[in-house]
Amino acid sequence: MQIADQLRKGTTRLAVLHALESGPVYAYGLRRATRDKTAGIFDFNEGVLYPLLHSLEQDRLVSSSLRKVGGRKRRYYRLTARGRETLVRCRREWRALNKALDTILD
């Protein structure tokens, strides 16, 4: 596994929680928005995204609901209160880790 893949894998959960912060979104919309916002660095395939969303739902960080849009059913995901608290904590920890790593790399 390449170093970039390892780094990305370690931050995938944080990236998905952050993407859900702006409101409910269905999986493909989440994938597209994250890919576009990160210039393709985070481009989750279904084999990564759906199990992660399921895990976040089991941990009660995310909830989901089915909606009919244009005649098709889509599952929309949103952060729960617990998910928002976790996101705040993860951001704080990420920024501290990133700051510490910057001091090593400089």
Where are these regions (language model features)?
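Beta-hairpin "wing" of winged helix-turn-helix
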Residues: 57-73, 78
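N-terminal helix-turn-helix DNA-binding core of bacterial DNA-binding proteins
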Residues: 5-48
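Short beta-strand/turn micro-motifs at beta-sheet edges
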Residues: 2-6, 65-66
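Absolute protein N-terminus
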Residues: 1-2, 106
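Amphipathic alpha-helical dimerization/coiled-coil segments
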Residues: 85-106
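Short, conserved catalytic or interaction motifs in soluble domains
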Residues: 22, 58, 99
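Short, hydrophobic-biased segments on the C-terminal half of alpha helices
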Residues: 50-55
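Basic, amphipathic "hinge/linker" alpha-helix immediately C-terminal to the N-terminal HTH DNA-binding motif
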Residues: 72-91
